[in-house]
Amino acid sequence: MLSMSNDRADTGGRILRAAASCVVDYGVDRVTLAEIARRAGVSRPTVYRRWPDTRSIMASMLTSHIADVLREVPLDGDDREALVKQIVAVADRLRGDDLIMSVMHSELARVYITERLGTSQQVLIEGLAARLTVAQRSGSVRSGDARRLATMVLLIAQSTIQSADIVDSILDSAALATELTHALNGYLC
């Protein structure tokens, strides 16, 4: 028999998956809470018990999705080379991700790119800072405040993801990965 907490987690997961499918199908700006509830097979009050509004669902969905991508691209070592390899692989995966690209072309993206750090960005900064601290101890990453370094790494990678399409005629996917690798290695040395 399932516990209520397992059922609740499953319902939350269904809601987030429904939100993701709505974003891919309609774009972030046209997603409604009613459509998310319909696709998840739950009532609107069920959704409201977990999230106060559609924007909160979008934030949770993005954080969950990015965490999933990070789990799919493992870190193969504690040094700068392994970390840069993972960052480049994650950036490549996110550039080709329908959900992320749908979000990038929305009003929501403008908020998280120009006005404030979102939860997923903060999680990435904290995770990167922890990994950079380990790499600093081994001497493969230069000294400095790990959170500041992590924030700059996030800005470099985020800019690459956002701008990849507009420079595709100059930097195809492989060349972009090579140049991002050089940029990150140069910054972190």
UniProtKB/Swiss-Prot annotation:
Keywords: DNA-binding, Transcription, Transcription regulation
GO-annotated biological processes: regulation of DNA-templated transcription
Domain HTH tetR-type: 9-69
InterPro entries: DNA-bd_HTH_TetR-type_CS, Homeodomain-like_sf, HTH-type_TetR-like_transc_reg, HTH_TetR, Tet_transcr_reg_TetR-rel_C_sf
DNA-binding region, residue range(s): 32-51
PANTHER family: HTH-TYPE TRANSCRIPTIONAL REGULATOR RUTR (PTHR30055), MYCOFACTOCIN BIOSYNTHESIS TRANSCRIPTIONAL REGULATOR MFTR-RELATED (PTHR30055:SF238)
UniProt name for this protein: Uncharacterized HTH-type transcriptional regulator Rv2250c
